[in-house]
A protein has these predicted regions:
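Sequence-structural signature of mature extracellular/luminal beta-sheet repeat domains
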Residues: 1-292
């Protein structure tokens, strides 16, 4: 945020929380459900991907929380608007084309004032939802299903010039790119390689993708969980990638998100979800300034 604070979504308790420079926490709003990705819109409000809540397993020996399946009594998720001055929470979108949003996960605004968001879906003991990519307007006047189905889509981001949209699929460890034709419209195909997208990387082994940020050089920095938790930095032309592992005391099996801040955007703030921490790491390149 411009004042040097951070906004953090908390899935377990459904809170949108402000983190001060000294680490003090302040409640911004209780959104209920599970607060996942958050972005600031053109009106200065926070737009929240609320996944409707999840079961969590607590590992007492490590003081870790690990995500689980769809909870009992689950009714769905949606997009919420939070007034950062008053804490007022309003549901903006809960349905698309008559279908209830299941578990919105990550969100990014374009320079037109609209936003792309993913719906990750929910898992149950014997099956799970199919997910998708959506586009909405901040005034509540339009929400559109753009790509469906996708395999557990998670992080979403945009290239520095806004000409491409990136989506990470969690369980298969894949990062895709699509060209933007106009706001809410991608150059895609109904058949072929995942709606005609360009595969930038598919991770080997048991490594899963979560949320992302883009740096000023256009590299896509994807939070990674699994056997090699850390940040996977993917070149925008798909020519290769590198992997950053956080050493002690920052080791955590659930590196789930990254954003850039500081006066020169060379500080990476990374969420370590199992241990419930946000850490600041010096980054070799400036991050990409967000549109709002």
């Amino acid at each position: 945020m411009p004042d040097g604070t951070l906004l953090v979504g908390q899935i377990v308790n459904g809170n949108l929380t402000r983190v001060l420079a000294d680490g003090t926490l302040e409640l911004v709003a209780h959104c209920g459900g599970g607060v996942n990705g958050v972005a600031i819109g053109p009106d200065g409000a926070a737009y929240v991907c609320n996944n409707g809540g999840s079961e969590h397993a607590y590992v007492a020996s490590r003081n870790w929380y690990l995500p689980g399946d769809q909870p009992e009594g689950f009714t769905g998720g949606g997009i919420q608007r939070v007034d950062l001055q008053t804490g007022e929470v309003r549901w903006l979108y809960t349905h698309v084309d008559g279908h209830r949003l299941r578990a919105p996960n990550d969100i990014v605004f374009d320079h037109h004032g609209g936003f792309w968001f993913t719906d990750h879906g929910k898992g149950r003991s014997r099956d799970r939802d199919r997910g998708g990519l959506y586009y909405g307007k901040a005034d509540g006047s339009l929400v559109r299903e753009v790509l469906y189905p996708l395999d557990a889509p998670n992080g979403v981001g945009m290239s520095p010039d806004g000409s491409r949209v990136y989506v990470a699929e969690t369980f298969v460890g894949r990062l895709w790119a699509w060209d933007v034709v106009e706001p809410g419209v991608l150059r895609s195909k109904p058949k072929g390689r995942v709606h005609g997208g360009e595969l930038l990387v598919g991770l080997p082994g048991y490594d899963l993708f979560d949320s992302m940020a883009v740096d000023s050089d256009g590299n896509v920095c994807v939070a990674t969980i699994g056997d090699h938790p850390g940040i996977t930095i993917v070149r925008p032309d798909g020519s290769g990638y590198e992997h950053l592992v956080l050493d002690e005391p920052f080791t955590d099996p659930m590196n789930t998100n990254i954003c850039f801040g500081g006066p020169d955007l060379r500080t990476a703030y990374i969420t370590l979800s199992a241990s419930g921490r946000v850490v600041a790491v010096d980054w070799p390149r400036p991050g990409l300034a967000l549109n709002y």
